[in-house]
């Protein structure tokens, strides 16, 4: 019922409950419509829309200089948003933060806060401007003809009720807000996936939910993380409400002590946290749990995060099990948390809870209506312009008559009337002719007018088709979406782990956790944080566990948990053992995969795989078995190696510390459950001493004896009889004595070395270095024979300070090898052109480089008579996480001099880093 109007100053008696009901309803609707909930069309709340439009009016486009945030906030307050300045600035800051918005709409200059919930600098210090996506996908072409405008709070200005968004920002950046009696919580999504979903609905409006959810598999948070359970996503997308469990990204590292005699330590390293988790508060939570005695096994806790990304190191005590600590962190801290989804937004100024499909359909309807208004407005403008051009061309064609009229006309009005009568033009055309500059009479200007007239006529015809034919309009919409995807889309940051349980099973007190526990493989791709105003590198905060009282003679060597206090102090970053890069050289050899850097942990039930199953190892050194061979169609990550089990029960694993261990095939999990770091399956002594796995494979049958060729990082080589590994026990066997920090880099099974003869020329050992040098020698001639496991081998090749080994193989003197550099240059080389050398030599330079930064990446034997067609293709992985394939026949014969041919097209700043297994 409308409220009665009363004279000003009159006191009206009113029941309290009626006034409270009316006032509260007005307040509730004001909060719902005008403050807390976003519009489904452009995904913006009023404050965000007003900030964008105010900056658009100020001309703060991406190609213009930054402007002080205080100026922007002042314009927003004075023109459109009569609220507190701090609330407007807080909204502006969140639009800049790349950890709050998946696709920030504003670019910032200065300190805009951090993931630790550090406050931003005051608005008088920070500067901002529109981001390219805001200008190119939100505000382009905004005008009263395209979208509706309304008066501001005092009707002195006009503001848009919605911006002509070309992308559904409601899904891209998400939104959260608490209104009166309702709330919204929408997670961010990947732009490329959302565009694919929109195009899928355009092509097939009755697209099934299953097909739609394949195109948009789940949220994509700006801070990364792992989504564990797809059931929560399915429920949220279908009903508009649901819980999505999100887990931080972690891996296990073996940290080498800074002192010589200090022991290696195991640490859990967190590189990504769930969305909206405060890192500093999370670290304090862990510290509190440790001090309260609720979380045992942690000896040190520090934050090593810097501008390159997040890194929180949790060092463990020597007897602690990493998987047990990790499970407790999931259960007791926000390292695993649920993101509550509520798809609530305004539709026609009314709050509506929608499914994912409804949100996409609402946006498509809005975008189609906006395009229609845009085309109609452009058509009207073009028709008016075409009319004027037609008049100008008529005047130029009748130039003599035009001059005569102008010469004898008494005034402009008379001239206009005579032009209309003699040339048959309209009033507007007459005005255009009279206002035409004299330069229009020239021939060149006349041609320009004619060309513009032709182009306008064609555009008008196109616009009439677009307005009259909905299918053509939808084609234009799809073209627009594809263009925006190409311009703004990026890789997914949040990995969705299918089949992972969302619930964390509580561990009983004093229960020994399973040694096989591990979390799924992790790819950390944290984006660099915004550089702060403060100069220099940021200090790292370390939470150190210290005794609150000095130790006494009777005290135990290790402090009790109850006696531990946490103190915050800056410390240098942990010194990590760097894995030496080395490419794969033959099918039976695995390069030095850095298991220490990525050693994730999950629970699985041991089971024996079928005899025909396959084993595969990824670039993180994680292994799993699968019933069928992986191909490019069913593998979603590059592999270091893949081979058939062939009924074997034991796998031989050799670490870079030179020790071999047997691994039961039954201890390896199936790929359907997870991958497990190969190093983690080994005994604790191997996990403590080794940082990488140098070799994994099966022993040959006794009737086909083979020797084991071992080459260290410092260039020492030795042969070991294969029979030494036949009786390998659980305690392992030391294969090579390593001194002075040397590590085992290559290990491969080879045919036993026999003296060469005319009938059997024998095999040569070929070693390649990163500087492009090759050393070839005959093992029999130089006296390379099988030695005992305790021998340290002989110095095969002298290496320079910045040089490392990149390839080792056994080949016949008449064979050819393929060489490839990090910059993508390759060639085929005849080994006969490399002179035979001896132990301790530098070798022969066989590769030239196009730049000083380039290095030889790998050396492989040319596949002459290869049994598998896959072996004729080589795959390489780059520092930009791109996969490049090279065919064997692309390597052309070259001599020792020359760069070779450019075989791989690389982006700027991209270079190849490793060879991976080729998947057919």
From Swiss-Prot:
Active-site residues annotated for this sequence: 125 (o-(5'-phospho-dna)-tyrosine intermediate)
Site description Interaction with DNA, residues in chain: 45, 81, 83
UniProt membrane topology term: Peripheral membrane protein
Keyword Methyltransferase part of the UniProt annotation: no
Catalytic activity, EC: 5.6.2.2
Record's subcellular location: Cell membrane
Chain spans, region Disordered: 499-566
Biased segments, Acidic residues type: 528-540
SUPFAM superfamilies in UniProt: GyrA/ParC C-terminal domain-like, Type II DNA topoisomerase
Annotated site residue numbers, Transition state stabilizer: 124
Topo IIA-type catalytic domain residues: 37-509
Sorted UniProt keywords: Cell membrane, DNA-binding, Isomerase, Membrane, Topoisomerase
Pfam families linked to this entry: DNA_gyraseA_C, DNA_topoisoIV
GO annotation, cellular component aspect: cytoplasm; DNA topoisomerase type II (double strand cut, ATP-hydrolyzing) complex; plasma membrane
InterPro entries: GyrA/parC_rep, Gyrase/topoIV_suA_C, Topo_IIA-like_dom_sf, Topo_IIA_A/C_ab, Topo_IIA_A_a_sf, Topo_IIA_dom_A, Type_II_DNA_Topoisomerases
GO biological process, one term: DNA topological change
Membrane spanning stretches: none
Function: Topoisomerase IV is essential for chromosome segregation. It relaxes supercoiled DNA. Performs the decatenation events required during the replication of a circular DNA molecule.
Family stated for the protein in its record: Belongs to the type II topoisomerase GyrA/ParC subunit family.
Complexes and interactors: Heterotetramer composed of ParC and ParE.
Annotated protein name in UniProt: DNA topoisomerase 4 subunit A
Organism: Synechocystis sp. (strain ATCC 27184 / PCC 6803 / Kazusa)
Gene: parC
């Amino acid at each position: 019922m409308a409220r009665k109007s009363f004279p000003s100053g009159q006191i009206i008696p009113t029941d309290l409950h009626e006034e409270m009901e009316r006032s509260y309803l007005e307040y509730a609707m004001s909060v719902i419509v005008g403050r807390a909930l976003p519009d489904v069309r452009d995904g913006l709340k009023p404050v965000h829309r007003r900030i964008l439009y105010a900056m658009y009016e100020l001309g703060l486009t991406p190609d213009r200089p930054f402007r002080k945030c205080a100026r922007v906030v002042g314009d927003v307050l004075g023109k459109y948003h009569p609220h507190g300045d701090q609330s407007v600035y807080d909204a502006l800051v969140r639009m800049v933060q790349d950890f709050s918005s998946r696709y920030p709409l504003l670019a910032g200059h200065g300190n805009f806060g951090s993931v630790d919930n550090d406050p931003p600098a005051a608005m008088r210090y920070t500067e901002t401007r529109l981001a390219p996506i805001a200008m190119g996908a939100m505000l382009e072409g905004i005008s009263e003809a395209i979208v509706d405008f309304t008066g501001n709070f005092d009707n002195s200005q006009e503001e848009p009720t919605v911006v002509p968004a070309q992308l559904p920002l409601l899904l891209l950046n998400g939104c959260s807000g608490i209104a009166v009696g309702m709330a919204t919580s929408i997670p961010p999504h990947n732009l490329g996936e959302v565009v694919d979903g929109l195009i899928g609905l355009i092509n097939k409006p009755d697209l099934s939910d299953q097909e739609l959810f394949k195109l948009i598999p789940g949220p994509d948070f700006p801070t990364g993380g792992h989504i564990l359970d797809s059931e929560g996503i399915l429920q949220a997308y279908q009903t508009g409400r649901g819980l999505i469990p999100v887990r931080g990204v972690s891996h296990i590292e073996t940290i080498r002590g800074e002192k010589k005699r200090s022991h290696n330590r195991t640490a859990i390293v967190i590189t990504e946290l769930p969305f909206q988790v405060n890192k500093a508060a999370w670290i304090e939570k862990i510290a509190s749990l440790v001090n309260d005695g609720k979380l045992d096994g942690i000896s040190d806790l520090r934050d090593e995060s810097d501008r390159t990304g997040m890194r929180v190191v949790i060092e463990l005590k020597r007897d602690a099990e990493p998987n047990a600590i990790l499970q407790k962190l999931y259960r007791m801290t926000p390292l695993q948390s649920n993101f509550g989804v509520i798809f609530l937004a305004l539709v026609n100024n009314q709050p509506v809870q929608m499914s994912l499909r409804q949100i996409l359909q609402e946006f498509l309807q809005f975008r189609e209506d906006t395009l229609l208004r845009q085309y109609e407005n452009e058509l009207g403008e073009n028709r008016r312009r075409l009319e004027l051009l037609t008049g100008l061309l008529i005047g130029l064609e009748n130039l003599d008559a035009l001059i005569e009229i102008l010469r004898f006309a008494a005034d402009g009005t008379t001239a206009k009337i005579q032009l209309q009568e003699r040339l048959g033009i309209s009033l507007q055309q007459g005005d255009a002719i009279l206002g035409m500059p004299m330069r229009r009479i020239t021939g060149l200007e006349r041609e320009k007018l004619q060309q513009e007239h032709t182009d306008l006529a064609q555009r008008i015809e196109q616009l009439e088709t677009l307005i009259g034919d909905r299918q053509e309009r939808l084609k234009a919409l799809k073209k627009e979406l594809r263009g925006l995807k190409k311009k703004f889309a990026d890789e997914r940051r949040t990995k969705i782990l299918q089949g992972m349980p969302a619930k964390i099973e509580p561990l009983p007190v004093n229960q020994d956790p399973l040694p096989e526990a591990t979390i799924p493989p992790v790819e950390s791709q944290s984006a660099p944080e915004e550089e702060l105003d403060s100069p220099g590198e940021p200090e790292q905060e370390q939470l150190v566990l210290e005794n609150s009282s000095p130790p006494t003679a009777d005290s135990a060597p290790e402090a009790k948990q109850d006696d531990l206090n946490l103190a915050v102090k800056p410390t240098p970053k942990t010194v990590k053992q760097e894995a030496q890069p080395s490419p794969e050289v033959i099918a039976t050899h695995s390069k030095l995969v850095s298991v220490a850097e990525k050693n994730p942990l999950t629970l699985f039930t041991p089971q024996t795989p079928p005899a025909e199953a396959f084993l595969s190892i990824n670039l993180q050194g994680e292994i799993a078995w699968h019933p069928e061979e992986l191909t490019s169609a069913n593998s979603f990550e590059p592999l270091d190696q893949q081979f058939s089990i062939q009924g074997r029960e034991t796998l031989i694993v050799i670490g870079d510390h030179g020790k071999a261990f047997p691994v039961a095939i039954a201890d390896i999990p199936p790929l359907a459950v997870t991958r497990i770091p190969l190093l983690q399956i080994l005994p604790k002594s191997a996990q403590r001493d080794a940082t990488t796995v140098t070799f994994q494979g099966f022993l040959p049958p006794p009737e086909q004896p083979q020797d084991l060729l071992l080459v260290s990082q410092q260039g020492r080589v030795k042969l070991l009889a294969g029979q030494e590994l036949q009786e390998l026990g659980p305690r392992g066997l030391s294969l090579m004595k390593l001194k002075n920090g040397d590590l085992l880099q290559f290990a491969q099974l080879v045919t036993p070395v026999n003296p060469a003869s005319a009938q059997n020329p024998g095999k040569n050992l070929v070693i390649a270095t990163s500087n492009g040098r090759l050393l070839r020698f005959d093992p029999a001639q130089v006296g390379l024979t099988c030695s005992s496991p305790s021998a340290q081998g002989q110095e095969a090749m002298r290496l320079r300070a910045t040089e490392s080994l990149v390839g080792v193989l056994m080949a016949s003197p008449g064979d050819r090898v393929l060489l490839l550099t990090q910059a993508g240059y390759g060639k085929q080389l005849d080994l006969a052109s490399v002179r035979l050398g001896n132990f301790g030599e530098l070798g022969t330079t066989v590769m030239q480089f196009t730049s000083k930064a380039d290095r030889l990446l790998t050396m492989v034997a040319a596949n002459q008579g290869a049994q598998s067609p896959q072996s004729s293709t080589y795959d390489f992985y780059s520092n930009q996480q791109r996969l490049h394939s090279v065919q064997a026949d692309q390597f052309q014969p070259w001599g020792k001099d020359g760069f070779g041919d450019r075989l791989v097209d690389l982006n700027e700043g991209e270079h190849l880093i490793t060879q991976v297994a080729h998947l057919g």
